[in-house]
Amino acid sequence: VMAVEARIQMPNVTGTAAQGYWPAFWMLGAPFRGNYTNWPSLGEMDIMENVNGVNTVWATLHCGTSPGGPCNETTGLGGSTTCPDATCQSAFHVYRIEWDRSGASEQLRWSVDGVVYHIVNQGDVDATTWANATGHGFFIILNVAIGGSWPARPSGLTKSGIPMLVDYVSVYKSI
């Protein structure tokens, strides 16, 4: 089992002041570097995404072809949950993906503060799609975008300059 996790406090802004905010912690397949045209087949694992300051975290595997394809692109194979105990914006939370290759079938598991809320199994897509999306290295990305294809468009009420705070990023591998 390999796990990638980070302890993050999303930008502490909500309501109309958060319109357009899009913090994310994600991994993109290494074959993207130098090619830039092979998304989503090379795999993208969104460990944490949030939009517009709502108390929801999204997790998604992007793979296959776009639009449509075995991973329902451009949406991907995703799930969501609220942050436990305190909002995503008002406190630090641990966002994690576990990549379990220990069984006969591989599995990706997403959790927040130790609570699993989304699972994608190898059998959810065909073997070629899974191999193309997971059979290589990944690079980790942490970013905050303002605007884009998913969040609302920023308005005059959007408060700029609110940071995403990152306590740590770790990668673990079972021996």
What are these regions (language model features)?
Residues 1-175:
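GH16 jelly-roll
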